[in-house]
């Protein structure tokens, strides 16, 4: 552990479950790196992701965005190409970008949006994009004919959440440069979405634990009973 990390841990009581407000304040105090650290939530859920009926996945637009400039690749054809360009997509095309990803290992983008009629071609990228969490998916709104709306939401701060194989959801909610209230607003919107996404097959306690941390800082535990207060 580095000197700054050790200093940060002294500000936190590991046994305490903080209120969301206290946790956001501490997350900013413990973000001591000399760059604009990302503030991220880690939510342990009472689900078994090995079962299809206990998957937790979706997307939500954070009111204040994530503080990160998101590069959007749109795979479309026909009239949708100009529509995507006008909406502010960073890259727009079809088979040429699929080949570029396959042959050149090109990944200068953060989100991929595809129209439904392109999914036959995009499917060839499943093994490449899937492990990176970049594969377009209807549940997250990235497979759609309304590419303009999808791009606008992504640029406005839309984030995807998905439970991993350890039953944890990791989602960025802002930057060290954010005010506490903006982090709190983003936190509440995200938590509301995840609570609403609870699978009917999930039994027992749904929110096992909630923690927030900066890129280089320690985790700060949040009282899961008070997440929407």
From Swiss-Prot:
Going by the entry's taxonomy, the superkingdom of the source organism is recorded as: Bacteria
Alphabetized Pfam families for the sequence = Ribosomal_L1
Keywords noted in UniProt:
Repressor, Ribonucleoprotein, Ribosomal protein, RNA-binding, rRNA-binding, Translation regulation, tRNA-binding
Which Gene3D superfamilies does the entry link to? 3.30.190.20, 3.40.50.790
Q: What are the transmembrane regions?
A: none
Family listed:
Belongs to the universal ribosomal protein uL1 family.
Q: What is this protein called?
A: Large ribosomal subunit protein uL1
Taxonomic source organism: Clostridium kluyveri (strain ATCC 8527 / DSM 555 / NBRC 12016 / NCIMB 10680 / K1)
């Amino acid at each position: 552990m580095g000197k700054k990390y050790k200093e940060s841990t002294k500000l936190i009581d590991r046994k305490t479950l903080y209120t969301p407000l206290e946790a956001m304040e501490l997350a900013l105090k413990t973000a001591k790196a000399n760059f604009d650290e990302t503030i991220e939530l880690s939510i342990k859920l009472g689900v078994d992701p090995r079962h299809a009926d206990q998957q937790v996945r979706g997307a939500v637009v954070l009111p204040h965005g994530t503080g990160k400039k998101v590069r959007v690749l749109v795979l479309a054809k026909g009239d949708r190409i100009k529509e995507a360009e006008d909406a502010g997509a960073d890259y727009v095309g079809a088979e040429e970008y699929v080949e570029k990803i396959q042959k050149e290992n090109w990944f200068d983008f953060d989100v991929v949006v595809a129209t439904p009629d392109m999914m036959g071609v995009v499917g060839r990228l499943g093994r490449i994009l899937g492990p990176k969490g970049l594969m377009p998916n209807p549940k997250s709104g990235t497979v759609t004919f309304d590419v303009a709306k999808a791009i606008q939401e992504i640029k406005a701060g839309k984030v995807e959440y998905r439970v991993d194989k350890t039953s944890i959801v990791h989602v960025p909610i802002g930057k060290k440069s954010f005010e506490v209230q903006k982090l709190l607003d983003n936190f509440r919107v995200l938590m509301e979405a995840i609570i609403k996404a609870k699978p009917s097959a999930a039994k027992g306690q749904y929110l096992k634990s909630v923690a927030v941390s900066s890129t280089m800082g320690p985790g700060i535990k949040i009282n899961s009973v008070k997440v929407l207060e």
